[in-house]
């Protein structure tokens, strides 16, 4: 998904599609609609294509793509959802470590029982994608929804690699917005 990027993301997708990776499909947004909406668009597309499962991974090359085989093995063993769990936060600066820890702690305090240190790096079966498709809300919090499905799940630990190019666009404000979306779309605790 090219979420309205200003770099060469779309050009790379087009080039990959035409050469050795004809199976690569790309979706392009005209502007940045945000991480969750981009992921949902990609998952809806995969579901329409009739996939058995889908894996989401960030394009910044920090998540270990060699672990996808382990995700698929766990899927073949019967897991409907396989979470990518960061082994540690060594690659994060102090502020990112603190905000990451606070994010998961706060979300769980608010009643969104999410798996600590899992990112958007995950495998979802067709059954999990069908479950997601039943949600008609516009602001979905995927980390909460998938943890709440009751479907059989497992996890794969991975090391976060150093960022090769550029800086993360996921700022403290982005993390705050994600937490707010998670609380307002997934937790009833603030209403009590």
Where are these regions (language model features)?
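Membrane interfacial helix-start motif at the N-side
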Residues: 168-169, 180-192
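Short, conserved SAM-binding/catalytic segment
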Residues: 16-20
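A conserved acidic beta->alpha catalytic loop
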Residues: 2-11, 61-62
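Short beta-strand/loop segment that forms part of the nucleotide-sugar
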Residues: 1-5, 27-28, 57
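Acceptor/aglycone-binding surface of glycosyltransferases and processive sugar-polymer synthases
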Residues: 24-48, 53, 65-145, 161-180
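Short, intrinsically disordered, charge-balanced linker/junction segments flanking boundaries
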Residues: 1, 72, 78, 190-192
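Conserved beta-strand segments of alpha/beta enzyme cores
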Residues: 23-25, 152-154
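Alpha-helical transmission elements in cytosolic ATPase-linked domains
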Residues: 8, 12-15, 41, 70
């Amino acid at each position: 998904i090219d979420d309205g990027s200003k770099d060469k993301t779309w050009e790379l997708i087009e080039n990959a599609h035409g050469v050795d990776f004809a199976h690569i499909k790309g979706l392009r947004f005209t502007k940045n609609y945000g991480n969750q909406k981009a992921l949902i668009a990609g998952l809806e597309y995969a579901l329409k294509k009739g996939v058995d499962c889908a894996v989401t991974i960030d394009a910044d090359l920090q998540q270990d793509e060699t672990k996808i085989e382990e995700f698929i093995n766990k899927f073949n063993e019967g897991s409907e959802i396989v979470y990518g769990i960061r082994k540690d936060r060594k690659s994060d600066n102090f502020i990112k470590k603190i905000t990451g820890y606070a994010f998961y702690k706060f979300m769980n305090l608010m009643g969104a029982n999410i798996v600590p240190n899992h990112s958007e790096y995950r495998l979802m079966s067709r059954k999990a994608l069908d479950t997601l498709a039943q949600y008609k809300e516009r602001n979905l919090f995927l980390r909460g929804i998938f943890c709440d499905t009751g479907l059989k799940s497992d996890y794969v630990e991975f090391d976060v690699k150093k960022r090769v190019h550029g800086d993360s666009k996921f700022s403290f404000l982005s993390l705050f917005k994600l937490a707010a979306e998670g609380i307002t779309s997934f937790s009833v605790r603030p209403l009590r």
